[in-house]
Amino acid sequence: MKVKPSVKKICGVCKVIRRNGRVAVLCSNPRHKQRQG
């Protein structure tokens, strides 16, 4: 899980979701997991 000031989709499978007021990117590729922090 990467923590970044701005998150964006890296590939077509990535999904942007809101979790507890935080924006996160989930993907089948674990390297693409990001959270805004």
Curated annotation (Swiss-Prot):
Task: Please provide, in alphabetical order, the Gene Ontology terms of the cellular component aspect for this entry.
Answer: cytoplasm; ribonucleoprotein complex; ribosome
Print the keywords alphabetically.
Answer: Ribonucleoprotein, Ribosomal protein
Give GO MF terms, alphabetically: structural constituent of ribosome
GO biological process: one example = translation
Q: Which domain of life is it from?
A: Bacteria
Record family assignment: Belongs to the bacterial ribosomal protein bL36 family.
Tell me the protein's name.
Answer: Large ribosomal subunit protein bL36
Q: What is the lineage of its organism?
A: Bacteria, Bacillati, Actinomycetota, Actinomycetes, Micrococcales
